[in-house]
């Protein structure tokens, strides 16, 4: 593999790396390392073994849910990917979520969140507890972020499309943890991205560094005392990395840099490498992931703690309802549907947004004036005076949380064909001999059955992938048209 790198970039890297420069340049001649991160929200006993049987995976040393996969393998095309079983993510970027610490039952903000890798990582750690706000300033990227939040089955996430400065005027001293994976000059992407090589310049590095400081200022206003700020980039430029941390702390001396101890993943190989220290006065406390020292494209990360004592969060309009509450007509229809749900939903958190019924995160906040793409979990909507469950609800449910479940074993040809047919939008006829084998099973209240009527949670290998509606042995497909695959 050959790529032409900008001369000024090479000159700077030669000065920065010294004797390591040749090894760094040599790393550009090898193939990309690719990774996937298992989704804990979908994890079951069978899933890891199923993935291992299909792909030559091995652990990423700094991320217990992360795995490398083979260069010629395509897990992004797998039915399991459509079902949210894992997220495709560059291996070195997986360190960021691991540095967030124990964020269960906390208020967490992913400030520059698209396309959703860090958000899904944080959500997996939170395991449905607390509040996760995922923000993206660019509308099209915010839509992709929202789609990935849905695919990964995240219940407790609010997706916003705002500038950091506007959010900082609302959420003053509010969050326990903020992740800032700031837009950068992308030097860690240059080996695999021609656009990153073409657009690189010293001026762009300078502009990114200045923008990064503005974003950090917004994050500072939103982080409560005692809170944790995780700052990261996918660039090697000191102006955007160590220098950015030094400049920020010079303006806000109440912050200290914390070197979090990472535990090496069981089964990982010594040859896969490990994050290094950085440079400058905080060099021994920040993380540099160099492409010539480990198996990844490269990343920078630092953990900053604001002050010493943890304080109460600001209220951010706390206590104001978002929506107009339950109305009697749809309330009755939803109550009828909810009899099939085997998980309890708090009535205090169920609100309407137009015709949509939403399950808001436990932490209720006032979002008036904020562009919101997804306000927690979309339960469903009123269609012609009947309740129709949303795809997001299906993706968030486990098989044991719904009355009627179709589970398909994708390890067989018969099962894989049924999965592809479902994801293509076809109805599934369980009366057909090809649909009645051991690979395709219908359950009602956990007991295998041959027929049922009404809504069915369609699953693959024990994880949900969408809704169907059954009558006389035929499951009508309710997989969203915009997500359907071409056969």
Annotated model-derived regions:
Residues 1-16, 20-52, 297-300, 307-487:
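Polybasic, low-complexity RNA-engagement segments
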Residues 103-104, 168-179:
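A short acidic, Gly/Pro-enriched loop at the edge of an enzyme's catalytic core
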Residues 105-114:
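Conserved class I S-adenosyl-L-methionine
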Residues 115-128:
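Conserved SAM-binding loop of SAM-dependent methyltransferases across substrates and taxa
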Residues 127, 223-225:
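Helix-to-beta-strand junctions that scaffold the AdoMet/dcAdoMet cofactor pocket
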Residues 137-172:
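S-adenosyl-L-methionine
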Residues 140, 177-218, 234-241:
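Mobile active-site "lid"/loop adjacent to the S-adenosyl-L-methionine
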Residues 175, 228, 236-358:
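Class I S-adenosyl-L-methionine
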């Amino acid at each position: 593999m050959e790529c032409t790198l900008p001369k000024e970039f090479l000159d700077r890297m030669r000065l920065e790396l010294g004797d390591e420069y040749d090894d760094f340049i040599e790393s550009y001649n090898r193939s990309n390392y690719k990774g996937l991160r298992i989704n804990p929200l979908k994890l079951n006993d069978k899933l890891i073994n199923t993935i291992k049987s299909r792909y030559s995976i091995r652990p990423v040393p700094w991320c217990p849910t992360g795995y490398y996969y083979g260069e010629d393998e395509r897990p992004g095309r797998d039915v399991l990917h459509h079902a949210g079983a894992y997220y495709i993510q560059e291996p070195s970027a997986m360190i960021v979520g691991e540095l967030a610490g124990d964020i269960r039952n906390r208020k967490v903000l992913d400030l520059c969140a698209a396309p959703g890798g860090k958000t899904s990582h944080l959500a997996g750690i939170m395991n449905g507890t607390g509040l996760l706000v995922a923000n993206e300033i660019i509308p099209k990227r915010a839509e992709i972020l929202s789609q990935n939040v849905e695919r990964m089955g995240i219940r407790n996430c609010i997706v916003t499309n705002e500038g950091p400065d506007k959010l900082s005027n609302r959420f003053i001293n509010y969050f326990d943890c903020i992740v800032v994976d700031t837009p950068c000059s992308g030097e860690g992407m240059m080996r695999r991205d021609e656009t990153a090589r073409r657009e690189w310049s010293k001026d762009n590095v300078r502009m990114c560094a200045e923008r990064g400081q503005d974003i950090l200022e917004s994050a500072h206003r939103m982080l409560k005392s005692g809170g944790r700020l995780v700052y990261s980039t996918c660039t090697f430029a000191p102006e955007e990395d160590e220098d950015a941390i030094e400049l920020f702390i010079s303006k806000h001396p109440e912050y200290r840099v914390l070197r979090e101890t990472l535990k090496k993943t069981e089964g990982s190989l010594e040859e896969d490498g490990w994050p290094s220290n950085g440079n400058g006065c905080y060099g021994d406390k920040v993380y540099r992931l160099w492409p010539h020292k480990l198996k990844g494209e490269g990343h920078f990360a630092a953990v900053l703690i604001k002050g010493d004592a943890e304080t109460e969060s600001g209220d951010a309009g706390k206590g104001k309802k978002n929506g107009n509450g339950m109305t009697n007509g749809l309330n009755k229809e939803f109550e009828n549907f909810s009899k099939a749900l085997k998980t309890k939903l708090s009535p205090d958190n169920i609100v309407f947004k137009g015709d949509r019924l939403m399950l808001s995160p436990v932490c209720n906040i006032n979002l008036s004036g904020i562009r919101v793409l997804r306000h927690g979990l979309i339960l469903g909507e009123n269609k012609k005076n009947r309740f129709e469950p949303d795809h997001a609800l299906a993706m968030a449910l486990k098989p044991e949380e719904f009355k009627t479940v179709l589970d398909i074993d994708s390890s067989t040809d018969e099962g894989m064909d049924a999965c592809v047919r479902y994801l293509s939008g076809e109805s599934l006829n369980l009366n057909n001999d090809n649909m009645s084998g051991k690979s395709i099973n219908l359950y009602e209240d956990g007991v295998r059955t041959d027929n049922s009527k009404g809504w069915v949670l369609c699953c693959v290998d024990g994880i949900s992938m969408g809704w169907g509606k059954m009558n006389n042995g035929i499951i009508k497909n309710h997989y969203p048209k915009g997500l359907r695959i071409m056969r």
